[in-house]
Amino acid sequence: LVPCAWAGNVCGEKRAYCCSDPGRYCPWQVVCYESSEICSKKCGK
């Protein structure tokens, strides 16, 4: 598992997705753990 905030940083974004609401963006400080595959998809990779 990789913090989505970290994955977002890789994608050049300083925001992370909410685990409970994948369609919304959460502040950078929100701790949200999902699989790196899911995070990568959300970043359009």
Curated annotation (Swiss-Prot):
The alphabetical list of record keywords is:
Allergen, Disulfide bond
Gene3D superfamilies the record matches:
Amb V Allergen
Pfam hit, one: Ragweed_pollen
Per the record, the domain of life is Eukaryota
Q: Which InterPro entries match?
A: Amb_V_allergen, Amb_V_allergen_sf
What are the annotated disulfide bridges? C4-C39, C11-C26, C18-C32, C19-C43
SMART domains to which the protein is assigned, alphabetical: Amb_V_allergen
Description of how the protein assembles with itself and partners = Monomer.
Q: What name goes with this protein?
A: Pollen allergen Amb a 5
